A protein has these predicted regions:
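A structural "domain/chain start" motif
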Residues: 1-50, 158-178
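C-terminal/domain-edge helix-coil "capping" segments
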Residues: 1-9, 61, 110-178
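Mid-chain, structured segments of secreted extracytoplasmic proteins
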Residues: 40-66
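A general alpha-helical scaffold signature found inside nucleotide-binding enzyme cores
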Residues: 44, 48, 97-101, 139, ...
Length: 178
């Protein structure tokens, strides 16, 4: 379960693009002398971004793609770019660890990609609290998802890249569009 951010809400209308590649994200990897690993985090993404949006934006919508005609706002498209992991056997600790990198593609009012905000995340889970490797790795991955949510929430209002992007929806910018 993901907590709602306790931050001041942004008033700029935002469209969040939650596409199939995000909601179906599965990391598979074969580790020499360690076996095959499958980490499913895609199914948690919609809940994560619903909570994030509810706590951070006072005016937001969800869409499936940047091509949807209903988008009339700045748009954010999250993408899991990278996932790495370590097991207790590899690190000689009691923890499963997951490192993730999310890219947040930022689109202007004309649906042009203006920039990408990249956020690294880290999560861990104690092996003693989980029944197996898959369960432990998925718990660590969900912890990393909470981490990215926290970083996004805290840094959103202070990140210069975001401030520049939000200015694309200023009244002056909207007037210039006719």
């Amino acid at each position: 379960d993901f907590p709602s951010p306790l931050v001041e809400k942004q008033s700029t209308p935002i469209a969040l693009i939650i596409n199939k590649s995000l909601t179906d994200f599965v990391h598979t990897e074969t580790v020499e002398k360690g076996g095959d690993f499958v980490i499913e985090v895609g199914s948690a993404q919609r809940a994560l971004f619903e909570r994030l949006a509810a706590g951070l934006f006072s005016n937001h919508t969800f869409v499936d793609s940047i091509g949807e005609p209903s988008i009339s706002a700045l748009a954010i498209e999250p993408e899991i770019r990278e996932l790495q992991f370590a097991t207790p056997d590899q690190t000689r600790t009691d923890y499963y660890e997951v490192w993730m990198r999310y890219d947040f593609k930022l689109y202007d009012l004309e649906r042009n990609l203006t920039s990408t905000w990249s956020i690294p995340a880290y999560g861990k889970a104690n092996k003693n609290n989980h029944t197996g490797k898959r369960d432990g790795l998925e718990a660590a991955a969900l912890s990393a998802c909470r981490d990215v949510m926290a970083v996004f929430s805290i840094k959103f209002s202070s990140e210069q890249l975001i401030a520049d992007w939000l200015n694309l929806d200023s009244p002056t910018t909207r007037e210039g569009r006719g």
